[in-house]
Amino acid sequence: MREASEEAARECRRFRAEHRFGLVYVFGMTRALRLAGVEIPRIDLSAHPRLSEQRMQLVVRNKNLEPRVRAQDANHMLAVYVWDAPMDFACLGDDLIFTSPICTWAMLARFLSLEELIVLGDSILRRNTVHRQYSQADFKNYLIALRAVKGRRAPRGIVKCERALTLMRPGTDSSRETKLRLCIVQHGLPMPMINHRIRAINGNVYYLDLAYPDAKIAIEYDGMFHSGQWLHDSDRRNAIEASGWVFIQVTKTSLSDHSHRLMLVRRIAHELEMRTGIHYFVDAQTPLAELVKRR
């Protein structure tokens, strides 16, 4: 993601050199995510074309500035957004200002599904990031600040943000892992641990994508790797299984449709029952909007 951040920075500097609006540039939305090195969530661009990564998004505080900026957009590649709520900033170098990842997350809430808002939040909370490390408390504090402004309604999407936060978790490595975790809990299974650390029988330390430590069940998302990576992962899996763990491998196909997802959660439920004696009913899938209300 660092390369994407650097490329976005070059594009922003080039754009700024070609457009003189007489105001401080604050880049936002998907442009801000690219500058921060955050994975772009899935957006319905047919409904929200201005959020395309090809557009240059700017954020202004005062709606009166919007026409002034748009008037100079001869190529129609600029998208201007008004955000009069408390704004948080980040910088790249000493010349590029953009909305911070958490602020951008809140701004995008009204354009994203609840699932994609959770996925974006997890992306910001990942272990290895280009931007500074954030915690769930940072998200909570920003939402409190948005609610605390007297005499002004909270921005659209804040309720969705508050709900998304209940299912966001730090330390993930990919959006696929987040969607896997959400699939598991939507089908009535317990929330698994993320990046659980174990020392295998061979003495090596491994971090499991998702795990139920008490039942010694490891759930790993397997992407497409070259042969050398496959051999390494095979040795890793053998060591984990030799240490008494059940290893459940998940692929892109496992999450591709309802029947595959059901097959996966039934397998996890079976292993949990075999190791804990607890039976889980997993055939029904609870919508995320309903799930967050119960938490």
Report residues per predicted region.
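Surface segments flanking catalytic/ligand-binding clefts of nucleic-acid enzymes
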Residues: 135-295
